[in-house]
From Swiss-Prot:
MF terms (GO), sorted A to Z: mRNA binding; translation initiation factor activity
Keywords: Chloroplast, Initiation factor, Plastid, Protein biosynthesis, Transit peptide
Designated name of the protein: Translation initiation factor IF-1, chloroplastic
Source taxon at top rank: Eukaryota
UniProt source species: Arabidopsis thaliana (Mouse-ear cress)
Chain spans, region Disordered: 49-69
Length: 141
């Protein structure tokens, strides 16, 4: 019987077989103690069309925090006030008080930022009143 589905390649399923996710044919062996009979059944494993389980390619080098040629600087600061929609008041090391918003990776990974936390803020040279919070340094001391 031929089975087609959107995320897996077509495969041939024989009776009494199980499906796994990586395209290898493995014999399944059953031992019966009373008759000393060994049954060997081939098992077909299917493979995803994408070829992997997803996620990051671990062989690639890590990205630098700030790309070369960009007009951004990274400054450390202290969160003083929490505002709605992932916005914060941040006091920078140089004495400025800016509006900081959290970056997408912090939002995606549900990293909590509270008043009193030290953060790294990425700022553009064009607007010195706003910055993107790219890293939460450590727990509150």
């Amino acid at each position: 019987m031929l089975q087609l589905c959107s995320t897996f390649r077509p495969q041939l399923l024989l009776p009494c077989q199980f499906r796994f996710t990586n395209g290898v044919l493995i014999p399944q062996i059953n031992y019966v103690a009373s008759n000393s009979v060994v049954n060997i059944r081939p098992m077909i494993r299917c493979q995803r069309a994408s070829g992997g389980r997803g996620g990051a390619n671990r062989s690639k080098p890590a990205k630098p925090q700030v790309k070369e040629g960009s007009n951004k600087t990274v400054i450390e600061g202290l969160v003083t006030e929490s505002l709605p929609n992932g916005m914060f008041r941040v006091d920078l090391e140089n004495g400025d008080n800016i509006l900081g918003y959290i970056c997408g990776k912090i939002r995606k990974n549900f990293i909590r930022i509270l008043p009193g936390d030290k953060v790294k803020v990425e700022m553009s040279v064009y607007d010195s009143t706003k910055g993107r919070i790219i890293f939460r340094m450590s727990s509150r001391d």
